[in-house]
From Swiss-Prot:
Gene3D superfamilies: Crotonobetainyl-coa:carnitine coa-transferase, domain 1 (3.40.50.10540), formyl-coa transferase, domain 3 (3.30.1540.10). One of its GO terms (molecular function) is transferase activity. Disruption phenotype: Cells are unable to grow on dimethylsulfoniopropionate (DMSP) as sole carbon source. Coiled coil: none annotated. Belongs to the CoA-transferase III family. Dimethyl sulfide (DMS)-producing enzyme. Acts both as a transferase and a lyase: uses acetyl-coenzyme A (acetyl-coA) and dimethylsulfoniopropionate (DMSP) as substrates to produce DMS, acetate and 3-hydroxypropionate-CoA (3HP-CoA). Mediates the CoA-transferase prior to lyase activity. DMS is the principal form by which sulfur is transported from oceans to the atmosphere and is a key component of the ocean sulfur cycle. It comes from Marinomonas sp. (strain MWYL1). It is an enzyme of class 2 (transferase). At least 10 million metric tons of volatile dimethyl sulfide (DMS) are released into the atmosphere annually by the dimethylsulfoniopropionate lyase in oceans. It is a component of the tangy aroma of the seaside and functions as a chemical attractant that guides various marine animals, such as sea birds, invertebrates, and some mammals, toward potential food supplies. DMS oxidation products act as condensation nuclei, causing water molecules to coalesce, with possible effects on local climate through enhanced cloud formation. The active site is at residue 602. The keyword Transmembrane does not apply. The gene is dddD. Keywords: Lyase, Transferase. This is CoA-transferase/lyase DddD. Pfam families: CoA_transf_3.
Length: 837
């Protein structure tokens, strides 16, 4: 392995015209990875006035330029002439109207990579010109009306959350698109014009909120889902209290009060070993066995053929056993403090964690020791704790853990910095007349990946890469680790574009299959803690001995660039939501709630892992260096909480919008009833004069209680009226749509196309899905290059469907394959049915 310890994007130059969160954050990610970034603000400074700008603009040189003047435009164009990448996040067409035309720029400089990050897609005729703030995109995209089963049962619709999820997904997706374009440019010399709409990124990120499986068997429906169906069919009001709601939760997937009065989130459903370990450390396993706790040997046969009533490791459990186990677990958790249980679960390899606030998370020993939180010494805030990098490289991350504060420079200094970097760059790509014409191929055509991952985050990383042409072999064990809900139902999203093989790699023959696969691929990826690497033969020395050129990517739960006390703890999305403060903010510390449905952090962790893999591919193509890339759910939660995940001496209190009663950030950024429904107004004090000029809002500037004023006035007219009036005044406002509404109006039967031409929303219906069910899911459409191809990926195939094909491709004979199948070293399925009934 090349020991040269240089960040992979050293020499790459970026002009960052981004505002708000998403655009500047993409440039921040590139800067963290070594790129030289010049950030350009308008004369008044950043449009988002927030301490988090110190995070977004770290490792950057910043200056103000007035693009509305000829002198300012000339300066901007000169900076662009000296960079590889240009980033902007305005409404579609704004940069062109100011005199910066990305398409025209690439006609003279085809090597240039441009990234546009509008709130809504440029081909979305309805929404493209809206003032698309974070909350407006969220409201329009169904985020505030589909916030999980809890909120449905409590009758809370709409709900509000201050998490900038649209931007958080767009950061990983857009940074990945830049990395993909850089990788392609090393081969062809060509850049690309790329668009990543925040709304489309949000829809992909929250894909588990929107996918539908028709005629889903009852065994997969939770007690909450069944109660929702019951109330809807019998016209019963959704009015379940928080306390009542707890009794609809599975015992292995809920919050418990501990001896210190604080709460602990247990998340070990669907995995037989995790649930059993939990019951044993709680001291109630033997008691439950004595009371007749049933056991089902094979969960992948139809439920009508089970040899027992249920089994631990089944999610959801039937109510009878759920109630019995929950009562015993409640009493057991009261015997120790939440911190004590955190250590017991973590050291015992059981998923679970104490609920904590974001302030506690940012200042925790583990986050600071592991590099998940870093310290930046700046002039404005002094020593500021900030999120660490979202991707890093094993044994090479120290340079990423000491970010430099934002540096304010003159135009001349910024230009000189870019030119000095250009002078020493070692160019290895085609240039000038050698730049190749656009091929129309995928960025990852020919790249082969061995996917050893499970659940959501890991599999999502490679599913994401399949749209760009990557060839993915998904390798799973012959005996499944998870029940069919997590092990199969979730894979309808994460298994797309892959061939599936089942092999027991812990046997001698299976190990040989694994080694042949490693020799045949470019990347190996797994989600697992570091302690599992050597036993699995995935440590650096073992993998290099098999294939010295193979890249490696690992995702985990609590991992950071350095080792911390929780580095080897296992867990899921929900655990990091609980431990990092997301749940305490969403529901309040005393009544925490899961945020949205599934995959809120998982999916973004997958996107971040893909970013890391593509950066590794780029670095290898450019320098020949082979590396091991990392990310974690903990790193990703910090990006999702950029407005909150920081601290410094004198910081304002952590008192952001929180709880079920929160309907906005403040009176001018808030949900209000109209006489026909709801609207979300997202304004601020600087727009009071414009608000006062709107018919019906005259006098708001003099109001002593703006919230009450707006409640009184907005309810007098329809939502349509207010949307028209606010749009005319260029004030951000939107009607909250539901996911069902968006699906109904933006779905089509799968047509082998990607919905990049369909605006901000696109879903495909698969009536002939391999599962035998009709599936509707969001398109892989958020990344929209002008030249590279995005392909419509194949639906998830049945597990083991390609086992024989994969073994044949590795050179095994028919008799070899039959022998492995007979010995159960390999298998062609986990059960008769794809999704067991």
């Amino acid at each position: 392995m090349n020991k040269q310890n240089q960040l992979p994007l050293v020499g790459v130059r970026v002009a960052d015209f981004g505002q708000q969160i998403a655009g500047p954050a993409v440039a921040m990610v590139l800067a963290d990875l070594g790129a030289t970034v010049v950030h350009i603000d308008p004369p008044g400074g950043p449009s988002w006035k927030h301490p988090a700008n110190a995070i977004l603009n770290r490792n950057k040189a910043s200056l103000c330029i007035d693009l509305k003047t000829q002198a300012g435009l000339d300066q901007a164009l000169e900076l662009i002439e000296n960079v590889d990448i240009v980033i902007e996040s305005f409404r579609p067409g704004v940069m062109k109207r100011l005199g910066i035309d990305f398409v025209a720029l690439r006609e003279s400089r085809p090597e240039l990579i441009t990234l546009s990050m509008p709130g809504f897609a440029s081909n979305d005729e309805l929404h493209r010109d809206w003032k698309a703030t974070e909350a407006i995109v969220a409201a329009t995209s169904g985020t505030f009306t589909d916030m999980g089963f809890n909120r449905v049962l409590m009758g809370l619709n709409p709900s509000f959350s201050p998490l900038p999820l649209g931007s958080s997904y767009a950061i990983s997706l857009a940074a990945s698109s830049i990395a993909l374009a850089l990788f392609e440019r090393e081969k062809t010399g060509r850049g690309d014009n790329i668009e990543v709409p925040i709304a489309a990124a949000l829809m992909e990120g929250l894909s588990y909120n929107s996918y539908v499986v028709d005629q889903l068997p009852e065994r997969y429906k939770t007690m909450r889902e069944l109660e929702i169906e019951h109330r809807k069919s019998n016209n019963i009001k959704m009015d379940v209290s928080y306390a009542q709601l707890q009794e609809y939760l599975d015992p292995f997937y809920r919050t418990y009060v501990c001896a210190d009065g604080r709460q602990f989130y247990c998340v070990c459903p669907s995995h037989r070993n995790h649930a059993e370990r939990a019951l044993k450390v709680l001291g109630i396993y033997d008691e439950l066995v004595a009371e007749g706790l049933p056991e089902v040997k094979d969960l992948h046969v139809p439920i009508s053929e089970w040899d027992g009533e249920t089994s631990i490791g089944v999610y959801p459990l039937p109510k009878k056993w759920a109630d019995l186990i929950s009562e015993k677990m409640k009493k057991a958790f009261l015997q120790k403090t939440s911190d004590e249980w955190g250590v017991i679960f973590g050291e015992g390899q059981i998923p679970g964690a104490p609920h904590r606030s974001t302030e506690e998370w940012v200042n925790s020993e583990h986050c600071n020791a592991s590099g998940l939180i870093v310290e930046v010494e700046g002039t404005e805030f002094g020593t500021m704790k900030q999120p660490g990098p979202i991707v890093w490289f094993e044994n090479e991350s120290e340079a990423m853990l000491k970010p430099k504060p934002q540096e304010h420079v003159s135009f001349e200094q910024a230009l000189a910095r870019l030119q000095s970097v250009a002078k020493i760059e070692k160019i290895s790509r085609p240039t000038g007349q050698d730049i190749q014409p656009a091929s129309g191929k995928g960025w990852l055509d020919g790249v082969k990946i061995l996917d050893l991952t499970n659940v959501i985050a890991g599999p999502h990383s490679t599913a994401f890469m399949s749209r760009f042409g990557a060839e993915i072999t998904k390798l799973d064990p012959v005996t499944p680790l998870y029940d069919p809900l997590i092990g199969i139902l979730f894979t309808f999203q994460t298994g797309v574009g892959k061939q599936s093989a089942l092999v027991n790699i812990m046997t001698k023959e299976g190990r040989e299959v694994f080694e042949r696969l490693v020799r045949s691929v470019d990347i190996v990826v797994i989600n697992a803690p570091d302690r599992q690497m050597k036993p699995l033969g995935l440590d650096q020395d073992s993998l290099s001995a098999i294939n010295p050129d193979v890249l490696f990517c690992r995702l985990d739960c609590f991992g950071g660039p350095r080792t911390g006390s929780k580095t080897n703890y296992i867990g899921y999305d929900d655990i990091i939501q609980a431990n990092s403060g997301i749940m305490s903010r969403f529901g309040k510390p005393e009544t925490p709630e899961e945020h949205a449905h599934l995959g809120t952090l998982d999916v973004n962790c997958g996107f971040a892992a893909a970013l890391g893999m593509v950066i590794a591919l780029y670095q290898k193509r450019k320098t020949g260096k082979v590396c091991r890339v990392r990310t974690s759910l903990s790193a990703v939660t910090n990006i999702a909480q950029i407005p909150f995940a920081f601290d410094y001496e004198g910081r304002a209190p952590f008192n952001e919008a929180s709880g079920r009663e929160a309907m906005g950030n403040h009176a001018l950024s808030h949900f209000y009833r109209t006489n026909s429904g709801w609207v979300f107004l997202d304004s601020h004090q600087g727009e009071l004069a414009k608000l006062d000029a709107i018919k019906g809002l005259n006098g708001i500037q003099q109001s002593q209680d703006m919230g009450q004023f707006l409640r009184d006035q907005l309810v007098k007219e329809s939502s349509a009226y207010w949307l028209k009036e606010f749009a005319a005044a260029d004030i951000a406002c939107a009607e909250p749509f539901s996911i069902e509404y968006l699906r109904e109006h933006n779905s089509r039967v799968a047509d082998q196309k990607v919905g990049t031409d369909l605006g901000s929303y696109a879903f495909s219906i698969f009536p002939d899905h391999p599962s035998g069910h009709c599936i509707t899911q969001v398109d892989p459409y958020s990344i929209r290059p002008r030249e590279a191809k995005i392909r419509a990926v194949t639906p998830t195939e049945k597990f083991g469907c390609s086992t024989i094909k994969v073994l044949q491709g590795l050179g095994y004979s028919e008799s070899d394959i039959n022998d492995m199948l007979e010995k159960k070293i390999a298998a062609t399925g986990w059960g008769r049915e794809f999704l067991p009934s």
